[in-house]
Structures are given as C-alpha cells and as structure tokens.
Regions:
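Glycine-rich phosphate-binding loops of nucleotide-dependent enzymes
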Residues: 2-236
Length: 236
C-alpha cells in the first residue's frame, strides 16, 4: 500500500476550480516531484493534503487513514511535515526557538535534543546562528530553517513547496543535496519545485500538473527526456 494516496480530488476557490480530479501516490522511500507552471495547482495540492484546504470530492489517504476532512493540526500529528512556500518563519524568534515550534505536536520530548543535533548536522550554518533572530537570516538560511522546523516533527512524509525559490545557485545545490540526504535516511519527500530540472534529477517519480489536472507522469529520468516536458519546463 502507498504511504500517501490522493484519489480524484477536486478543489474550488469560490466558483473557480483549482484542482480537477488530481490523483497521485507516494511510496515509502521515494522522492516524488510535482512540476508545472505558476497557477497550475501545485501549492493547492500540497495545502489540500496537509488539511489547509479541503477537497469537495475525492479522497486523501495517508498511512492507511482517510484524512480528507482532517484539519491541519491533525495531519501534522498523523506524520505530514509541510514546509510551505514563503517559509513562514517566526522572524522575531531565534533559530532554536523556531526549530522548537516544530515539536509542538510531539509526545516523545526526550528525542528533541538529538533531533536538533540532526538538523544542525544537516545545516551547520543554522548551528552557527542558533541564537540569531530568524528575520535577520539570509534567504538560504531561512529556507534551511523552514526545512529543519518541519523535520523536528519527525514526519513520515516531508512536503516542500518551492525550496529553491529566490536562492543563489550554490545555495540551491546545498538544499537539493540535503534533501537527497534526508531521503536516504528514510524520509519520503513530496517536492513542488519551479526548477524542474533539479526536481526531476532527484525525483524517483514525478507528475506534471497543468491547469489543475495531472497530464503526465513517469520516473524523473523519463520526464527529463520527454520532449513535451523539455519544451514546456526545461527551456529546451
């Protein structure tokens, strides 16, 4: 059974339909990318999975449980970590306190120090800035902090929305290197990313979303070599 199974979800904003029968799945150990142009429905898909939006029809099943109507705080407790577009940090709190905000749903408080150490191992720059206000960090450091905060919940699935947006190429490389490391340590990842080449390069599988509908799916390598994908998203 897939860890996450999204089946035929339809989502509306008022009278505007944002998602049209979207279906996708994620298995244990996978990185799955969701690519598409701006306004295609990628962020809405993540928000619907995490309980920030709700589908009018269709189902979202996570770890064997139907979470279609679950509020966001329940999906966090179920094991879904979501690092949203725009990072959504607490700018007047220090780095360490932002990380601690990711632990609010945890019952195993004893494991928190080791998980903070793990985040600092993944992102040494955060350790150097542990007492610095989040609002004074660079864009790349803020993205590291957003990912680290999501990891502090010990998610069974990590969802990332545009992790490389606005970052310099060298920081983009760092973020993607760490994502593959997180995945290699056992955490599945659902990745929405405007840099389609990088996303498909690290993804085991991927979906292409256009105007709210899935129009193509395959392995990352298959979509990298697809003429349609190359023309529309890879600038070839």
């Amino acid at each position: 059974m897939a860890l996450l199974e999204v089946s035929g979800i339809n989502v509306f904003y008022g009278r505007v339909q944002a998602l049209r029968g979207v279906s996708l799945s994620i298995n244990a150990g996978e990185i799955v990318a969701l690519i598409g142009s701006n306004g295609a429905g990628k962020t809405t898909t993540l928000r619907t999975i995490s309980g920030l939006n709700h589908a009018t029809t269709g189902r979202v099943v996570f770890d064997g449980r139907d979470i279609s109507a679950a509020p966001a705080h329940d999906t966090v407790r179920a094991g879904i970590g979501h690092a949203p577009e725009g990072r959504r940090l607490f700018p007047r709190m220090i780095v360490l306190d932002n990380l601690m905000m990711g632990t609010y749903s945890r019952k195993d408080r004893q494991g928190i120090p080791s998980d903070i150490a793990r985040v600092y191992e993944l992102f040494p720059r955060l350790k150097e800035r542990t007492k610095q206000l989040a609002g004074t960090l660079s864009g790349g450091e803020q993205q590291m902090l957003a990912i680290g905060r999501a990891l502090m919940a010990r998610p069974k699935l990590l969802m990332l929305d545009e992790p490389s947006l606005g970052l310099a190429p060298i920081l983009c490389e760092t973020i993607f290197r760490v994502l593959t490391e997180i995945n290699a340590q056992g955490t599945p990842i659902l990745l929405v990313e405007q840099n389609a080449t990088k996303a498909l390069d690290v993804a085991h599988r991927a979906y292409v979303l256009e105007t709210g509908s899935i129009v193509q799916t395959g392995t990352g390598k298959e979509l990298l070599s697809s003429p349609d994908v190359q023309r529309a998203y890879l600038g070839m």
